[in-house]
Amino acid sequence: MPNEQLRRMDAFTFPSYSFDLSTGEALFDYALTGPDGEQRFTEVITLPLPASPPSDERVATLGRVLELLHVIAGVSYYKTAAPHRLVLPAPLGPSAVALVTAVYTKGLAEYAYRNALPHVLRLRPEVPSGEVTPPVGYDTDGRRPLSAVGGGKDSIVSLEALRRDGLDPLPFSVNPNRVIEAVNVASGLPALAARRRIDPVLFDLNAAGALNGHIPVTAINSLIAVATSVLNGLGPVVMSNERSASDPNLIWDGHQINHQWSKGVEAEGLLRGALEEHAGLTDPYFSLLRQLSELHIARTFARIGGYDDVVTSCNAAFKLRGASDRWCRDCPKCRFVFLALAPFMPRERITRVFGGDLLADPAQLPGYRELLGVDGHKPFECVGEVEESVVALSLLGEQSGWRDAPVVSALIDAVPETAWKTAATSAVFTPGGPSFTPTRYADALGSLTEPARNLPG
């Protein structure tokens, strides 16, 4: 469909969905409609099947989770045209409507900003009238947790906290790549995986110049994880989103623009509320690391060991061909994670992990100046707060093995005095902020995150 026709689309709808219990395959249909006709899409999500048939209670609960997933996953297709009308397929309660509204507005805020589409920030779904049937309900208490794994340090910390405390987690991922599979192997735990197949038509439209941009993919993957958990009779889905995920990148048109919105605490609360209201699930989903800073998580990861040869937080690395290429060493995530880990690892160890020393490369200075708030705004990437970067730099400046590194010495001279004063009183190693983590799980994390006694020097 030509782009000029896409731009005239005035509504996005959800014609139907189906689920085959024998294959675990869900088909989600979507449509953009307008004066020139319609553009249809079908997404296919395949869930791993349980060893024995699920109970009627689980099947009913799964159906309610899939109803939410159908609507939330549509955000990938809505963005090709960004029509002013979002027409939901069935009545929903207020908590579910709040989730949908936020996913299509706050979750698409960066997309709206980059494409100059302020109307997206004010989008309100059209909800059919009618009563919502109360959910059957499903109790996840005492069941084996599903621990989401992305291949980075954060999910490894969560997985190890649960495992070491006897909670017997199952690693989970959507469309696992070689990086995630390597982490699963290193953990020694059996893993579950779901598959998400985006309609190829979407890629064709994108290649032809359709509107495109960042989507709240964590919201989609979270619901896929919850659906997997219910189908397989498992317990809560444990995520590894830290507190800095709630920190916006900038303000535009009176709205916060946050690259990580769907990883933030607001999105977590909305998703939990919708799952309780619509599917009858209590405590089905939470982030174990919510109250920790990125720097706190990095310190904990450095003390775990066993994953140095497989860990990566670099998005570009997922596209690299070489088996040893886990870090591109030239993106905001590589820069930040290197900076966050460096104070807690000997230089030789972190250089081996990354395949190079970013703090010895003067070409990295412009990117590090952004991370430290010296130039520009916080990058549109999953990186920590400016304060955390300054604290990490201050720790490096105190260590003989790091203080003379070219990038470290140059950055120390560039950071303003006010930032140093803030770093001196920083609480980055003090857990804080809102959290939905149940006490049993919070205790498991606490046993792993006790302060380190010695730093490499």
Swiss-Prot record:
It catalyses: UDP-N-acetyl-alpha-D-muramoyl-L-alanyl-L-glutamate + ATP + H2O = UDP-N-acetyl-alpha-D-muramoyl-L-alanyl-D-glutamate + AMP + diphosphate + H(+). The keyword Thylakoid does not apply. Pathway: Cell wall biogenesis; peptidoglycan biosynthesis. One of its GO terms (molecular function) is racemase and epimerase activity, acting on amino acids and derivatives. Keywords: Cell cycle, Cell division, Cell shape, Cell wall biogenesis/degradation, Isomerase, Peptidoglycan synthesis. One of its GO terms (cellular component) is cytoplasm. Its EC number is 5.1.1.23. Belongs to the MurL family. Cell wall formation. Catalyzes epimerization of the terminal L-glutamate in UDP-N-acetyl-alpha-D-muramoyl-L-alanyl-L-glutamate. This is UDP-N-acetyl-alpha-D-muramoyl-L-alanyl-L-glutamate epimerase.
